[in-house]
């Protein structure tokens, strides 16, 4: 009787695994139907990233890990700044050059 129960259990597990494999392979045939973002969405994201990147720059490496115009990014575990701010005049100049590109992206 114990052997019969083991055989039934193995058959049940085998049929369950076949059902899972069949379902998975059915899902794999529909992979070609991917959703791609519209160009409007990607243009808006790229413009936003350019504006954000224009304001900050990587750690400038001043002695002691300080930044000349303050810290615009988070602090690392040892207290050093991740991104240093630019001077206000330089940041305004860069933002003005990026803004026309952002307006062109709008339809």
From Swiss-Prot:
Name a GO CC annotation attached to this entry.
vacuole
* Name this polypeptide is given: Late embryogenesis abundant protein M10
Please give the positions of the paired cysteines in each disulfide bond. Answer: none
Q: Which UniProt keywords apply?
A: Signal
Q: Which biological process annotations from GO are given for this protein?
A: seed dormancy process
Name the source organism.
Arabidopsis thaliana (Mouse-ear cress)
Say yes or no: keyword Transport present.
Answer: no
Described by its record, this protein's role is as follows: May be involved in the acquisition of desiccation tolerance during late phase of embryogenesis.
| Signal peptide start-end | 1-19
């Amino acid at each position: 009787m114990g052997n019969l129960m083991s055989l039934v259990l193995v058959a049940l597990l085998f049929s369950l695994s076949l059902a899972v494999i069949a379902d998975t392979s059915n899902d794999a045939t529909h992979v070609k139907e991917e959703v791609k973002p519209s160009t409007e969405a990607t243009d808006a994201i790229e413009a936003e990233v350019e504006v954000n990147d224009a304001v900050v720059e990587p750690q400038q490496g001043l002695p002691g890990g300080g930044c000349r115009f303050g810290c615009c990014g988070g602090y690392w575990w040892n207290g050093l700044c991740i991104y240093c701010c630019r001077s206000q005049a330089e940041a305004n100049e860069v933002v003005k050059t990026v803004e026309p590109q952002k307006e062109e992206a709008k339809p």
